[in-house]
Structures are given as C-alpha cells and as structure tokens.
Amino acid sequence: MALVSADSRIAELLTELHQLIKQTQEERSRSEHNLVNIQKTHERMQTENKISPYYRTKLRGLYTTAKADAEAECNILRKALDKIAEIKSLLEERRIAAKIAGLYNDSEPPRKTMRRGVLMTLLQQSAMTLPLWIGKPGDKPPPLCGAIPASGDYVARPGDKVAARVKAVDGDEQWILAEVVSYSHATNKYEVDDIDEEGKERHTLSRRRVIPLPQWKANPETDPEALFQKEQLVLALYPQTTCFYRALIHAPPQRPQDDYSVLFEDTSYADGYSPPLNVAQRYVVACKEPKKK
C-alpha cells in the first residue's frame, strides 16, 4: 500500500516539476526583452561616446528589472530542485521498502549477486547524479557537502551509502562501500550490507567504523573550501572496485562536473604512489590515519 502511495506522490511531483520547467522558460522569455534593451543602450552609449544622465537613469532601471527577473527565475529553479530531491527521496524509500518486503517482479526472480558490470554502472550513475550544492549568496555549504564531514551526532539513515571498516576473510581490515540497514541507539552500532554482495554479507559496526558518504557535490567555482585540497590524505574508492584505499589528492575538481585526481598508496611504484586516477566526489572521504612517511 505504501508503495502505491509513493507512486502516486511521485506522479504528482513529476507533474509539478513539468509545470515549474515551463514557468522557467516563460520567465526567461519574458526577461529576454529587457536584456536586449540593456545591450542596445550600451551600444548607443558607445556610439555617442558619453554617459548622459538619461542613459544612467535608464540603465539603472533596466538593471533593477533584470536583477528582479533573475531572482524570480532563480526561485523557480530552486523549487524545481526541491521537487527533484523529493522525487529521489521517494524512489529511495520505495527501493528500501521493496528490499525489506522481498518484492521482485515475476519476470525477474531474486538474484544472489548482481553482475559486476551492472554494479559498476550503478555506482557511476550514483556519482553522476549526486546533486550539486547550490546555496544562496552568503550561505555556507552544509555537512556532507563535498569534503565537509557529518556532524558529531549525525546518524546515517537506512539506505544511505557509507565507507565501512570491516574484517576481511584473511583477518585484515579494509574499508568497503556499504549500505546502512539500521542503527541501534541502545548499542550505538550500525548494521550495514556490503554493496558488492547484494545483502549477503551483513556487518555490525561501531560508529567510528562508519563514514557517511557526501550527499552533495561541492561547487569548485563557488565553494572551493568544501573540497579536499592537493596532498590531503583521503580514503578513495579505487576505480572498478567497491573498496576504499588511502590516497593523496593530486588535484581537486576545477568544475562542478569534474572528479578528483588522486594518487593511491601503492608499494609497487618507486615513490609509493600510483599514477593519477580519477575518483568522483561521491566516493572520497576524509582519512583520519596519519600519512605514511
């Protein structure tokens, strides 16, 4: 029943999102005339080679209108982003509910494990669709934006992806990509599923063994302080795997769509580090251990 309710709400939100997109285009078309007037006024001023009181007053009015138009369009876009975030949240809730209930399509019976190629594609899609933090002027990026860690009392929710420190079969410890199943306030411990085993491998871990992954990408152009910087030690997901390893930041992203360039610790190389490899913001978290000398 809850799944049906979620489906109907998602349909409503998609309709509302479509209307907001139409409003955005209408707002942009409406403001176009004013922008053309600004350009033409500047061209006349250049032709006459002077700034008369008339042009000064006219431009002040045109720019005031342009600013108001831009703010109106911005408000519509923010509403659209809120709708998208709500849709994604409902889809995630629906996925978790189906997983708990053990629901599967008749045409697709349960599989013990997901094909590795499919899993890698899903991880790439998750990184690409991670929302970009877009704050208002003066806003600071929140916790879990880029390199900014979660607050001390933060508890990851069921379905959230985390880096989890677990014991491997050989007894060694490693950081894996995992999904939160539950959290017990009585024991202060998480239950997490290894993402690579489709729930087959479940671990019970203390809070210090779980690092929540970023929930927003940081924009290098507006919030560079929310990114890890060159030579900073991190844990990064090694490409085409589901394990995190220690690495140094070689270069932070330069544009919102860019990845980090990182150097993984690797004793097979003379300097102890691999050549630069790209890792998405989604899969780079702080490493609290000291650098190797």
UniProtKB/Swiss-Prot annotation:
Point out the annotated site residues (description: Histone H3K4me3 binding): 238, 245
Subcellular location, principal:
nucleus
> What does the annotation give as the result of altering residue 214 to A?
Does not strongly affect binding to H3K4me
Domain of life where this protein originates: Eukaryota
Ranges for region Histone H3K4me3 binding: 264-266
Kindly list any coiled-coil regions of this protein: 3-88
Q: What is known of its domains?
A: The SGF29 C-terminal (also named tudor-like) domain mediates binding to methylated 'Lys-4' of histone H3 (H3K4me), with a preference for trimethylated form (H3K4me3).
**Descriptive protein name:** SAGA-associated factor 29
This chain's source organism reads Homo sapiens
The organism's taxonomic lineage, starting at the top: Eukaryota, Metazoa, Chordata, Craniata, Vertebrata
Q: Which gene encodes it?
A: SGF29
